[in-house]
Amino acid sequence: MSSILLLTSSPRADSLSTPIAVDLAEKLKSQNPGSVVVRRDLAANPLPHIDDLFTGAIRKPPEARTAEETVAVKTSDELVNELLAADTIVISTGLINFNIYSSLKTWIDNVARAGLTFKYTESGPVGLATGKKVYVVLASGGVYSQGPAAPLNHAVPYLKSVLGFLGISDIETIYVEGLAFGPEAAEKAIDAAKSRVQEIALAA
């Protein structure tokens, strides 16, 4: 059974990245009978930030953890299992201060676990979350996929770097950009993103 992990992170009620990502996940599901969508609304249901208790607990084998430490890593363990079980991951975020939403960053902090999603070797770190396809839906008021503002887009390079570190390199970004350039530009950007979603679904 195929698993699609859907991660939405925008806190905005009028978010554009969220409905496009949801539509993509649902279309992929409809194209693959028997598949399931596991959704994490990271804005509506914020994850716990890592703290001293958490960082100490993950450095111990499970059997050596105290009851309090076990509770501290419970959510992280669930998130790691969801990530490893997923065949496809759909991520939505707005470009906030040139990067991803903090809610999505917290998810990353919870799933980047040595021994679970990556490991250290004598020749360097090796990602363990391999064999997955990722789609990133990125919304922004300006244009950051190309042109003079492209160097300010830290979201896509960061996601490619950190997901690559975990062993995930097959990543496509669906830009919904130029939304602040007026209604006509916004409509054009939304239509282009929806068209790409349809193309992806038909090819699935």
From Swiss-Prot:
Pfam family, one: Flavodoxin_2
Name recorded for this polypeptide: FMN-dependent NADH:quinone oxidoreductase
EC code: 1.6.5.-, 1.7.1.17
Organism: Rhizobium johnstonii (strain DSM 114642 / LMG 32736 / 3841) (Rhizobium leguminosarum bv. viciae)
Catalytic activity: 2 a quinone + NADH + H(+) = 2 a 1,4-benzosemiquinone + NAD(+); N,N-dimethyl-1,4-phenylenediamine + anthranilate + 2 NAD(+) = 2-(4-dimethylaminophenyl)diazenylbenzoate + 2 NADH + 2 H(+)
Domain of life: Bacteria
Key word Flavoprotein present: yes
The family this protein is said to belong to: Belongs to the azoreductase type 1 family.
Function as written in the Swiss-Prot or TrEMBL entry: Quinone reductase that provides resistance to thiol-specific stress caused by electrophilic quinones. Also exhibits azoreductase activity. Catalyzes the reductive cleavage of the azo bond in aromatic azo compounds to the corresponding amines.
Chain ranges passing through the membrane: none
